[in-house]
Amino acid sequence: MTDTRADGVIGPAAPGEPGTATGRPGKSGRFLSLATLRTHWLIGALLVAGLVLRVLALIAYQPALIYVDTLKYLYGASPGSDPLGYLVVLRPLLLVGNLTVVAAVQHLAGLALGAALYVILLRRGTNRWLAALAAAPVLLDAYQVQIEQMIMPDVWFEVLLVAGLGLLLWRPVLSVPVAAVAGLILGSSAPVRQIGELLIFPAALFLLVAMAGTGRVIRTGIALVVAFAVPIVAYCSVSYVRTGHFWLARGQSTVGRVVSAADCATLRLPADVRPLCPTPAEQRFGPDWLEHSKYSPLFSAPIPPGAKRGQLISELTSAIKSHQPLRIAGGIAGDSLRLFSVTRDPSPWIAPIWRWQFQTHYPVYPHWTQLGPGNAIVVGVQTKLFGPFHFSVLKPSYGGPAQVNHPIASFLRSYQLDGGFTPGPLLALFAIAGLAGSVLALLRRGSPRTRALAVGGLLFTGTAVVLLLAPDVFEFSWRYMLPATVTLPPAGVLGFSALLSLGRKAGETPDGPAPGPAAPAS
């Protein structure tokens, strides 16, 4: 049997306590449940609040929210632009239900993320109040709830991420089989969102810092790397058979980022390339517009007869990278700080934030989605960039016409815009604490408990750096910042707990002095 210790960690129950064979018969389950609820009441309250938000989202928007990228998974739009691992979850759910069922399951996954983070941090030795603090953002952040209501793969990427990191941290000593399973799970995130390819780097760093013994590190590292590669290679192999391309997807271009940083007035360019270089007014529309809009000078500027536009764009970006690299780096650095801003205001520079906010109406994205007679959802499928759209009504099996419960939608929107998201300064504090814990881990300072907390903080902090900084190399989007809710809070809590542990006297626990030897049972 297990019970909850004073520090909030689930462990063996002491003899004679409720829940053991020597406790009061017939009441062990009730005592255990009451004790657990009393001990973990805060995470319980957060889970209930998170559940209420998700039920409201389900009621507010029927059958679910559909975004431009949703059509890639439902109709095969824009083939090759993103990996399609999401279909492994989506197709079975659509066999038994419609898009509402998919959204409901995604909301359950969001709740599970909060519970999982709480348990992982308790297992690692944090205070239960701090563990609940780390779980609160993913449970209560309206941007997280909105993406769960949308038919998009993001929540499943987070599930695989937290599951893989949790396995790496589950036991004090990482075994080869557990490392292999963790690698397999983390590698499976890449076919869901391509940025998952980068997760091997923080995981490998964790192994190097957390484990002792060269032989053990090598064996465990090989198991992790090989297992990580298996789902990626498998997906790429299937892609090669079907499309002739051994890839997850064609990958995102840096063209928009590079040309948005250019000072075209001082840049030396060939005469046939110069018309493609954007003016300051055009640059204010940001990297996304410059790279994807047909009105961008990259695609609208006249070119000489016989010239290839793609070659001219390549010459332009090469010149900018060679002569103005600091301007590119400055643009990336500036966007990387947006996550920590006090407010989330619309900006023409970045992808419109309203895409990730609850609306009082059913959101549409002409020509990709729009509403027809009777609020029927009409989708426009485009198979190539700037190609023609093929329109049809949403398949009946996916759900009926768009329906919005306006009072609930208004409440959700007000909640989101009036503070129902994780504040940027709080995320900054989490990041600073996580970095401090990472320094402790790298310096190998403190007691075994301190180091366990510090290396856990290192793993989550490294993961956050990879997942949050890498997208900024291409363009900033609030959607790409969503993994912050499942990486920065646990990183900060683990780092802060490591600092507390470092300053605590030996023999103390997170909740006070260590208990003395238990009296023998009478």
Predicted ranges, named:
Residues 75-108, 483:
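Short hydrophobic/aromatic helix or loop-helix immediately within or flanking a transmembrane segment
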Residues 38-41, 97-104, 330-460:
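Membrane-interface anchor segments at the N-terminal boundary of transmembrane helices
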Residues 248-397:
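Membrane-proximal stem/loop segments at transmembrane-domain junctions that anchor or position
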Residues 117-140, 158-159, 172-181:
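Transmembrane-helix signature of polytopic, membrane-embedded enzymes
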Residues 68, 102-111, 136-163, 168, ...:
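Multi-pass, polyprenyl lipid-linked donor-dependent membrane glycosyltransferases
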Residues 135, 179-193, 227-235:
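Membrane-interface alpha helices of multi-pass inner-membrane proteins
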Residues 1-54, 220, 224, 456, ...:
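Start-transfer (signal-anchor) and selected internal transmembrane alpha helices
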Residues 38-65, 139-140, 227-239:
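Transmembrane signal-anchor helices characteristic of membrane glycosylation enzymes that use polyprenol
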